[in-house]
Amino acid sequence: MDDIELLNDVLGHTADLVEGVQPGDWERPTPCSEYDVKALVAHMVGWSASFDAAANGHTPKGDPTAYEVTDKSAGEFRLAVTSIVGGWRDHGKDREVSLVGAGGMPGQMVFDMTLMEYLAHGWDLATATGQAMPYSEDTAQEVLIRAEHGPLANEQYRGSDQPFGPIVDVPLSAPAIERFAGFMGRNP
């Protein structure tokens, strides 16, 4: 599977999970301890606009953390992920992009961040809502490899005051999605 197919697979399945959230799910806790399901969906949809802008060569507008869930959120997310995939397909990764405003970041790095962000939060959402885990072993393994060889392998991003918790040891015999969740600081 090439990079664009991988991205389409992760984002498409994650959009399916967002669409699968039921009204009774909003207050459920998630493995991402700072979010319940509603706050997690708000985070995912809010940040999708920034990832969309980066993929399409625009400067992100607005505060992704200010997004509030509505009855249109699943549709907004589906549109954003379609645009994200199209942006990376049309413009490539060999360029600098802006994810959070001023300053450029390597396109490949932001592309990989997109994969990790939405695979991790897709796992969180499926786990919290009881939906079937939609990601294939190959997809999860490829994203795990990228995560293990990227900046998140550095301890400076992990801990109580950092975006990610410590790596949770998961047996090598476990499915790749569980090993990925452990790498991202979740306890599968």
Where are these regions (language model features)?
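Glycine-rich loop at the start of a catalytic domain that most often binds anionic cofactors/ligands
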Residues: 44
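Extended, alpha-helix-rich binding/interface surfaces that flank or overlap catalytic cores
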Residues: 40
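Structured surface interface patches that mediate subunit assembly and partner/cofactor docking
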Residues: 2-13, 20-33, 49-188
